[in-house]
Amino acid sequence: MKRNYQPSRVKRARTHGFRARMATAGGRKVLSRRRKKGRYKLTVSDEKLGKKY
């Protein structure tokens, strides 16, 4: 039986990546909140990843 989470790095980046966040007003709000809070990673694009990305 197939479960819900079928990880794909491309889909993850396109949905939650920096460019996706910057594309909408709400996404820019998300980024500003995370900057204000002092998050180490603003988006999934900031993760330290291997060659697959």
Curated annotation (Swiss-Prot):
Keywords of this entry: Ribonucleoprotein, Ribosomal protein
Gene3D superfamilies (alphabetical): 1.10.287.3980
Region of interest called Disordered, as start-end residue ranges on this chain: 23-53
Pfam family, one: Ribosomal_L34
Top-level taxon of origin: Bacteria
GO cellular component, one term: ribonucleoprotein complex
Sequence similarity: Belongs to the bacterial ribosomal protein bL34 family.
Protein name: Large ribosomal subunit protein bL34
Lineage: Bacteria, Pseudomonadati, Spirochaetota, Spirochaetia, Leptospirales
